[in-house]
From Swiss-Prot:
Pathway: Cofactor biosynthesis; (R)-pantothenate biosynthesis; (R)-pantoate from 3-methyl-2-oxobutanoate: step 1/2. Mg(2+) binds at residues 43, 82, 113. NCBIfam families: panB, PRK00311.1. Homodecamer; pentamer of dimers. InterPro entries: Pantoate_hydroxy_MeTrfase (IPR003700), Pyrv/PenolPyrv_kinase-like_dom (IPR015813), Pyrv_kinase-like_dom_sf (IPR040442). GO terms for cellular component: cytoplasm. The gene is panB. Keywords: Cytoplasm, Magnesium, Metal-binding, Pantothenate biosynthesis, Transferase. Its cofactor is Mg(2+). Its EC number is 2.1.2.11. The active site is at 180 (proton acceptor). It comes from Francisella tularensis subsp. holarctica (strain LVS). It is found in: Cytoplasm. This is 3-methyl-2-oxobutanoate hydroxymethyltransferase. Belongs to the PanB family.
Length: 265
């Protein structure tokens, strides 16, 4: 997938869209060689890569650094970058400066969270030539309002509000919407009522696509195992075993061997 046109086509043809997060050059190069459709440089990188408490601590400088790294490694992939916490809530000028910074760092599109107070901003960004992806449901930047990472849309009123939000984001010009941690039947209803694709994370299988944090699906974080994550490998054990083998071989002087040494001329 090279552009937003790919998202539109996927919605029409009902081809599922695959997305993962990425925050660094090395993993971006690996992803670039895969069949993945799109990469999200998420503000979650502040937590996953930098060890911050939650995404409200991720800065624009962090996002620029990670976006540049991913863009350098994944040269053939469509890249979406998150606008970090409060970067689009201060003024239109600071919002557009943040958008420009991420696009000039290598992103092809921008994602922001929520609808309330964002619709005019989204329209302005889209009118400026920058594609926007929306994000509703459990929006991590609102963690302090939610009282933690909690499933959203579990009441009839909340479900109705989510559908209204999704339609407003579509009308504002979003080319796609992330649905995070909402009941599967609600996600299905939203998906069927939009002409733009939905990307689910903890939203069931009836969205137009899926996204996971790369380190989660690779089993690299043993402390974070939410219900919606499938571990495709036990990355934590894989890496730990490899490092411990290296340590043992070093102490036993079985590494390096001749094949790893340079000969005299």
């Amino acid at each position: 997938m090279k552009s937003v046109l790919g998202f539109k086509k996927a919605k029409v043809t009902q081809e599922k869209i695959s997305m993962v997060t990425c925050y660094d050059y090395t993993l971006a190069k690996i992803i670039n060689s895969t069949d993945i459709d799109c990469i999200l440089v998420g503000d979650s990188g502040g937590m996953v890569l930098l060890g911050k408490k939650n995404t409200t601590y991720t800065t624009l400088d962090d996002m620029q650094f990670m976006t540049q790294a991913v863009a350098n490694g994944a040269t053939d992939k469509f890249i979406v970058a998150d606008l970090p916490f409060m970067s689009y809530r201060q003024s239109l000028e600071t919002t557009m400066q943040a958008v420009m910074a991420l696009i000039q760092s290598g992103a092809h599109a921008i994602k922001l969270e929520g609808s309330s107070g964002n619709l005019d901003i989204i329209k302005h960004i889209v009118d400026s030539g920058v594609p926007i992806m929306g994000h509703i449901g459990m929006t991590p930047q609102f963690i302090n309002s939610f009282g933690g990472f909690k499933v959203q849309g579990r009441t009839e009123e909340a479900a109705k509000h989510l559908l209204e939000e999704a339609k407003l984001l579509e009308q504002a010009g979003c080319f796609g919407i992330v649905l995070e941690c909402i009941p599967a039947n609600i996600a299905k209803d939203i998906t069927q009522n939009l002409d733009i694709p939905t990307i689910g994370i903890g939203a069931g299988s009836n969205t137009d696509g899926q996204i996971l944090v790369l380190q989660d699906m690779l089993g690299m974080n043993t402390d974070f195992q939410p219900k919606f994550v499938k571990k495709y490998i036990d990355g934590s054990k894989l890496f730990s075993d490899a490092i411990n083998t290296y340590v043992k071989e070093t102490k036993a002087n079985t590494f390096p061997t001749k094949e790893h040494c340079y000969d005299y001329c």
